[in-house]
From Swiss-Prot:
Protein's UniProt name: Trimethylamine-N-oxide reductase
Residues that coordinate or bind Mo-bis(molybdopterin guanine dinucleotide): 191
Biological function: Reduces trimethylamine-N-oxide (TMAO) into trimethylamine; an anaerobic reaction coupled to energy-yielding reactions.
Gene: torA
Subcellular location: Periplasm
Main location: periplasm
Keyword Metal-binding appears in the UniProt entry: yes
Cofactor comment: Binds 1 molybdenum-bis(molybdopterin guanine dinucleotide) (Mo-bis-MGD) cofactor per subunit.
GO cellular component: outer membrane-bounded periplasmic space
E.C. no: 1.7.2.3
Modification after translation (UniProt): Predicted to be exported by the Tat system. The position of the signal peptide cleavage has not been experimentally proven.
Protein species of origin: Salmonella typhi
Length: 850
């Protein structure tokens, strides 16, 4: 009981001293200094400048320069010929005012524990504690929740985290928590939630994260490329593993082909994208579709292909099932409305003749459909994904070089020929060691829920929802643990999140920046960035170009610790340290990962040097023999020997499996469903006339690097996140370029800086996702976000009962020039640290139950 007693003594001493302090009295003199001015306190003077330190990141490999112990510059790795502009912000990722410096506990939670006033979450008042105390509190809460409620009350989540095969927060969080007890797991993700559920039903695989046809073959064989909601040039800057950016050489070649007229590119998008602009504003045919009406356009294209006998009947007969069940809907035999070009014109805002001409062009020669992810991130996003496949099937070019469809062209260097190399392993989230609390009694609740519906579980526990053919009873969550993720960035409708957060008893966040998730947490633990540790990573994703050493650039800042060390010490508190570490430290794990890769290589005729030679001398190795690849070629060449993973083994234009689910919002074949809200004459557009896009940003990866002042200086407008708006819409509202505006709807309000641009169609506005939430009244529902997080405005509803994915792009807003008080942006300043000197008795290093 020594550990437990120490914890109680510590809290009593804290409370005794806290009671006599005012807020002003709790602020120590040094803490009155702005955090930005105190950032240098973390840097110990060094003896020399270090240059050329090789490491990697989501934005590419770099050579780092360190002066006096401080990461001051990032230069592109010499093997990256197309480096991202975002690497300029990487030093800020380490040294900025929003770094989490110490373990912190929310003031009222420190007073009352899990019985705290949860409406105070977000008030940004925290107490600094020692690592021992923070981990004791973490462990105590895990124990309490498992003993009081069981596994149905605990949810853990991770996300994009940092690069590195070993230091992955998701695996470490999963292993540590699983060694203590079971918990609620999640399925799906926020990027491709609708597509990744529907496509396995239609073509037998997820498609969204898979390799695409090699670009050299596309450039050689395609005559028409249709970019449908895909912005490759912008989005390929950042990848899951360290990108090599080789794919940009093919964009250069595509630009040359477009300029010469050898390839025609058509962009179906409400916006002139970065890719469209790069290939040539006047060279790319722009079909500026009304938002959320892509399915009517697809149906009209299919109708034209069928009615004008431009479709490939042989392909439909031999490689597909269900076209005959789909056809009556397409022709209007079911509902009296043919889904022809004249019908679609009224919804899409695209001339019927243009629609018919597009269908003829696509059928006229080899056509590659390049589909992005943004379109499926709206209500009924499954239908658009399904129709992409149907159109490609009707064209009959699936499995041919430069033809067919693909959903991952903008991600992970897709289309770059893959090399014959090895893929390193990493730190697994599972072990064979049983947990301390081995209960699998979820008390009738589901043990797995769709990630995009986790707020429903918090707000409506016990509610039964459908999900991909299953019935899910949402569990009554009481505690959440987040590592390497930021739900306040990735989840929709922030005021609904805040409402749900008030129902949780304990929230723990492990991160390196004071994101909104951390500000709304009870216990915050400071993790290192990838630049403060050693690791290994792939160089190139689909290209599998090589392996790179991620060398430590600077020492861990302040009291930040590696996730590995955080969870190791947590596991020590319940006698699972050995199971967590497997007896290895950081370098021990890197050697094991390397040795496993070496064994893998031997089976492929690849010889790797010893780890010591690689780490100390080479730092980078490159694989040979790029392999050309055609997506779905094997299936086309022999559908009997190479069937798809569908029940029929063929492309399912009609799915009996889905039809048997009897969902009214996702039936047996693709259909057009009206949205809850839609611009350009759709539901809700009279009150909220502007469609809001919240697509991937150009200067960060989701919310990562929003803390970089270096990068914000390149895009922020008046210190706010920019909102892009069409000149007609701006003029009608008296808005000029550079004005601070209020963007609002019934769900919330944000401030943003206006950028007036004709790249955006009338009725369409954009705020990039990942902007940090900055409420003027922290923790209050309906606060004004002073910086411009679009998820204050987005709608939290499932795409359908099939995928239950995010519908972020089903969002309408209004915009007006802002004339109210202009408070300073404080999102990037870190917390208001409440200082009370309290003695803490260190926890026992042995078994806390001794």
């Amino acid at each position: 009981m020594k550990n437990k007693d120490s914890l109680h003594v510590s809290r009593r001493r804290f409370l005794a001293q806290l009671g006599g302090l005012t807020v002003a009295g709790m602020l120590g003199p040094s803490l009155l200094t702005p955090r930005s001015a105190r950032a240098a306190d973390a840097v110990a003077p060094g003896a020399a400048t270090k240059e050329g330190i090789l490491t990697g990141s989501h934005w590419g490999a770099i050579r780092a320069t360190v002066v006096d112990g401080r990461f001051v510059a990032a230069k592109p790795f010499e093997q990256d010929k197309y480096p991202s502009k975002m690497i300029a912000g990487l030093p800020d990722h380490v040294h900025n005012a929003a770094r989490i410096r110490y373990p912190m506990v929310r003031v009222d939670w420190m007073r009352k524990g899990h019985q705290s006033d949860t409406s105070q979450r977000g008030d940004n008042r925290f107490v600094r504690v020692s690592w021992d105390e923070a981990l004791d509190l973490f462990y105590q809460e895990l124990e309490r929740v498992q003993k009081t409620y069981g596994p149905s009350a605990l949810l853990t989540a991770s996300g994009w985290q940092s690069t590195g095969m070993f230091h992955n927060a998701s695996g470490m969080l999963a292993r540590a928590i699983a060694l203590h007890g079971n918990s609620v797991s999640t399925g799906g993700d926020y990027s491709t939630g609708a597509a990744q559920v529907i496509l396995p039903r239609v073509v037998g695989s997820m498609e969204v994260y898979e390799q695409q046809t090699s670009w050299p073959l596309v450039l050689q064989n395609s005559k028409t490329i249709v970019l449908w909601g895909s912005d490759m040039v912008k989005n390929q800057q950042a990848n899951w593993w360290c990108p090599d950016h080789d794919v940009y050489q093919y964009y250069e070649q595509l630009k040359e082909k477009v300029a010469s007229g050898a390839i025609s590119v058509i962009s179906i998008d409400p916006v002139v994208t970065s890719t469209h602009d790069y290939l040539g504003r006047d060279k790319v045919k722009h079909i500026a579709i009304n938002p959320q009406t892509d399915v009517p356009l697809q149906l009209a294209l299919a109708h034209t292909l069928y009615s004008e006998k431009l479709y490939d009947k042989n392909f439909l007969d031999n490689y597909c099932v269900g076209f005959d069940q789909f056809l009556p809907y397409l022709l209007g035999e079911k509902d009296g409305q043919p889904k022809d070009a004249a019908w679609a014109e009224k919804l899409c805002g695209i001339d019927a003749d243009t629609i018919r001409a597009l269908a003829r062009q696509m059928a006229g020669d080899r056509t590659q459909i390049i589909a992005g992810w943004c379109v499926q991130r709206m209500q009924h996003g499954e239908q658009w994904s399904w129709m992409v496949v149907v159109l490609a099937a009707m064209l009959g070019q699936i499995g041919l070089p430069g033809g067919g469809f693909g959903f991952g062209w903008h991600y992970n260097g897709a289309g770059t020929p893959g090399r014959k190399g090895i893929i390193l392993s990493g730190f697994s989230g599972s072990t064979t060691v049983p947990p301390v609390h081995d209960s699998t009694d979820y008390k009738g609740y589901s043990s797995t829920i769709p990630i995009a519906r986790f707020m429903d579980a918090i707000l409506e526990p016990g509610k039964i929802i459908n999900w991909n053919g299953k019935s899910v009873k949402l569990p009554p969550l009481k505690m959440c643990v987040f590592a390497g993720t930021n739900p306040f960035h990735r989840h929709q409708q922030i005021n609904r999140i805040i409402e749900g957060w008030r129902k949780l008893e304990t929230v723990i966040a492990i991160d390196n920046q004071w994101t909104s998730t951390c500000r709304f947490a009870d216990i915050v633990l400071p993790a290192t960035t990838q630049f403060e540790r050693n690791d290994l990573d792939q160089f190139g994703n689909h290209s599998n170009r090589g392996i790179i050493a991620m060398k430590q650039v600077v020492s861990p800042q302040f009291e930040a610790r590696n996730d590995f060390d955080i969870f190791r010490d947590l596991c020590r508190r319940f006698n699972r340290e050995a199971a967590f570490t497997e007896g290895l430290d950081e370098m021990g794990w890197l050697k094991r990962i390397w040795q496993e890769g070496s064994q893998q290589g031997k089976g492929r005729g690849i010889h790797l040097p010893t780890f010591e030679v690689f780490w100390n001398q080479q730092e980078y190795i490159e694989f040979d023999h790029p392999q050309m690849f055609v997506r779905h070629q094997a299936f086309r060449e022999d559908p009997d020997l190479e069937p798809l993973g569908t029940p029929s083994g063929l492309i399912e234009i009609y799915s009996k499996t889905i039809a048997d689910m009897q969902y009214d919002d996702c039936q047996g074949h693709p259909m057009w469903f009206e949205k809850i809200e839609r611009s350009h004459g759709g539901p809700g557009s009279q009150r909220w006339p502007l469609h809001l896009q919240s697509v991937h940003p150009d200067f960060r990866l989701h919310s990562q690097l929003c803390e970089s002042e270096t990068l914000r200086q390149q895009y922020a407008v008046g210190g706010k996140e920019p909102v892009f708006i069409n000149p007609q819409d701006a003029s009608a509202r008296g808005i000029r370029n550079g004005d601070i505006v209020r963007v609002f709807n019934a769900r919330g309000q944000v401030l943003a800086g206006a950028v007036v641009s004709d790249r955006y169609a009338p009725g369409v506005a954009r705020i990039h996702e990942g902007a940090w939430y900055d409420p003027d009244k922290g923790g209050d529902l309906n606060a004004l976000c002073k910086y411009g997080n679009p998820n204050v405005l987005t709608l939290d509803t499932g795409t359908s009962q099939l995928a239950q994915a995010t519908s972020a792009h089903t969002t309408l807003v209004e915009i007006e020039k802002y004339t109210g008080p202009m408070d300073n942006v404080t999102a990037f300043n870190g917390p208001a640290e409440m200082v009370a000197q309290c003695e803490y008795v260190p926890a026992s290093q042995g078994n806390p139950h001794d």
